[in-house]
Amino acid sequence: CFEPEHVCLDNEIHVLAGGRLREECALLMQHSRIKPGQARITAGHHLPAKHVIHALAPKVTGEPTLELQQQLATCYEATLTLALENDLHSIAFCSLGTGHKNFPSPLAAQIALDITESFHAKHPEIKIIFCPYKDIDHNLYHYLLNN
């Protein structure tokens, strides 16, 4: 997020990581802008994480179409592929698309769990963590993971 003081997870990550993350993202964007469903990896800079994987969730206006659902699934797949390609041992996900992209939380959570469960069955060496930004998403993931 390049809007100063905008309240969103993306902006908070950039603030905590420091100015170098914004610079690295700006350089990436100069070479090629990502499309919904794609992901890119950068250094973590001042974050405790060594890397940040940036995924672009689709914007939902109205009902989420099958195409938008597939784009969200592809976000998770692309992110997990980057984690694997970069030999990462763990990855933490917020609830992609449920903020200002307006993806309905229950559907987004189910897509996330379907994709990550399938991936984890093939690659159990990578620890997958969910840390949703909003309380409603946190409660939803807690419920779905325990039932």
Regions found by a protein language model. Give the residues of each.
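Phosphate/ribose-phosphate-bearing ligand recognition and processing surfaces
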Residues: 59-147
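Glycine-/small-residue-enriched capping loops at alpha/beta junctions
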Residues: 1-85
